[in-house]
């Protein structure tokens, strides 16, 4: 039963009957009632004052009175400053609960036959994944799962940036200082070894620039003329020309990085339907540049570089191809956008990329529109803010960037400390305890990064993220484990709970009603989350469900309830809460334990 729809249709009928006013359902604005007022649904009546020619209070009272008299849904109503707050009868809530309980796929929406491609992760093969990548991966994975649950056909793709000047920098550094070492000989993950040489390049390059600046007296020229950078630029040209020696080194070092990435992705529970490699797609971008030149959409400067003038759109002139013919960052996006459209024919292409690239994706959409691409208006940049760490709370190998692997390991240690202190591993084997620490660590990390609006910059506090009493992943995970423990005791006591709860003469406790209200909102919250590409909506909602259940659990007995009808209902309510928690946490990429 869709209570929102029932109420909106009743309100539509009320306006027709009381004011002879025909209003579309879309104009019936129902919102959750604020906690300080009685009721669960609030009608905003201000938009109707002009048409009805009476005050909001009069409208609200007349509509409320009509609904209480003419429908079976309304137990009572109250009016606060022109807002109509509605309280629903317990029989309606119970009917809604029974439908939810019997639906093993409750909350999932039917197919809408819309295709969406979600691109996320997009790492560079010159360093390990870091804290910023974690927010990216968690957002991309969660958005994909949420869209799929909301009825979309979703394809998760990863574009690996495996070529370009930044890759050549680590290669040049390895040629100078690698001395043939391998991940095995150093006991390092491959991505960490390659990242070490990227850092080495940067250190030596800065030293060269400083020395040249003193000689030339011009820091800008020094930055361009530093020998190490010029070596990297030569190597990039050699790579694009197909130099076999350069390609062999590139394949070897990238192979190390991929092995390292695979380990990290496995820890994170991140998967993709298709992986693209820039080395295989960047030439497509050059083809698009050639097309744009032929059409007159792009233009070539005297030095041979290719540009587009977007000043009429309020932007600027954008470089598309360097004078030496090498690609820039946007070149490959031109080609891969076409390729994705050919591969999937999506209705929407979502890019999960940090907000430092906001301008880049605005430019990309304008270029595709100028080229007449049919999908130009269907490109969506899911922009997100940076993630910071409290000063001094997390070690860093380079002093500025935190490795994902290092953060995961420290989170697992923190989870172990908290879990042992609280005595939540009694009866666990060593392996079971180890699995639990990993589940809690990842739950803490993922939930903390997903619960906040993606656009906001985020301060990640490892200790706060794993607080079992806070607004955290482990609090929700513990709620699920608590329900699972109750249901095991129900099974041990051989209590039958499959019969449907009769609606007549059944009075809900306010705490039970709170739980049902939160559960009933799940399908709507899922849809809102999907439409806004906002996992934070669902993350907050599952927290409210867990809180409502814990309030009920603290006050009302389940196993020792004497009224068998009430006990039956509370057991079933517990089953549904566990089901919805497990479903939502799965959509967020989080595992919930059965025991703690």
From Swiss-Prot:
Catalytic activity: tRNA(Arg) + L-arginine + ATP = L-arginyl-tRNA(Arg) + AMP + diphosphate
Protease keyword on record: no
Enzyme Commission number, as recorded: 6.1.1.19
Major site of localization recorded for this protein: cytoplasm
Keyword Cell inner membrane: no
Subcellular localization: Cytoplasm
GO biological process: arginyl-tRNA aminoacylation
EC primary class: ligase
Annotated transmembrane regions: none
Motif extent ('HIGH' region): 123-133
Keyword vocabulary terms for this entry: Aminoacyl-tRNA synthetase, ATP-binding, Cytoplasm, Ligase, Nucleotide-binding, Protein biosynthesis
Superkingdom field: Bacteria
Matching InterPro entries: aa-tRNA-synth_I_CS, Arg-tRNA-ligase, Arg-tRNA-synth_N, Arg-tRNA-synth_N_sf, ArgRS_core, DALR_anticod-bd, Rossmann-like_a/b/a_fold, tRNAsynth_Ia_anticodon-bd
GO molecular function: arginine-tRNA ligase activity; ATP binding
GO CC list: cytoplasm
Family stated for the protein in its record: Belongs to the class-I aminoacyl-tRNA synthetase family.
Self-association state and partner proteins as the record states: Monomer.
Record protein name field: Arginine--tRNA ligase
